[in-house]
Amino acid sequence: MQPLLPPDRHHLRAAEGWLELGNDREAAAELERIAPEFSGHPDVLEARWHLGARAKQWDRCVAIANAVLERDPQRPTAWIHRSFALHEARRTQEAFDQLLPVANRFPAVWTIPYNLACYCAQLGRLEESRTWLQRALVLDEPTVKQAAAHDPDLKPLRESLGGALWPIVE
């Protein structure tokens, strides 16, 4: 896939800025300014995924992530985004099944084992959840601890450990 060039790259960056500021309407307007031949660029689609996620349009997010994966299967965020959208659409087993095959393809991405831990916890597979969370902690302990501190998806695991997750690493 060819890189986005100005002015399309500028519109994408502006859209990302608006997303960071929480202004979805302006972000969408900037994305609409991108030339039609680049509307399917993976970076543009990822920005559209974030808009859909903010609107909780999970089926749309699954479709967008699938489109990114068709164009760039080596992009770990596309795998993560698809599974996250499936989970939010109450299709947690499918989210797990879609993310598991790439866990070893992207061994340095902490979000993959972390999300697998969340999905396992929600599916009642607490030992498996614990194993995945340990794997995520090895990759980026400070970030994982911060993310997990109040993550409702990890509540079943937290409760099984007496309310605290951190005995996992001790």
For each feature predicted by the language model, list its residue ranges.
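Short coil turns that delineate tetratricopeptide repeat
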Residues: 5, 39, 73, 106-107, ...
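Alpha-helical segment of the N-proximal tetratricopeptide repeat
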Residues: 4-54
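Boundary/linker segments of alpha-helical solenoid repeat arrays
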Residues: 42-43, 76-77, 110-113, 139-150
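TPR/TPR-like (Sel1-like) alpha-helical repeat modules
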Residues: 121-122, 126-144, 170
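Register position in tetratricopeptide repeats
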Residues: 20-21, 54, 88, 122, ...
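Terminal, low-structured helical/coil segments at or just beyond the last alpha-helical repeat
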Residues: 1, 143-170
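Alpha-helical adaptor scaffolds
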Residues: 43-111
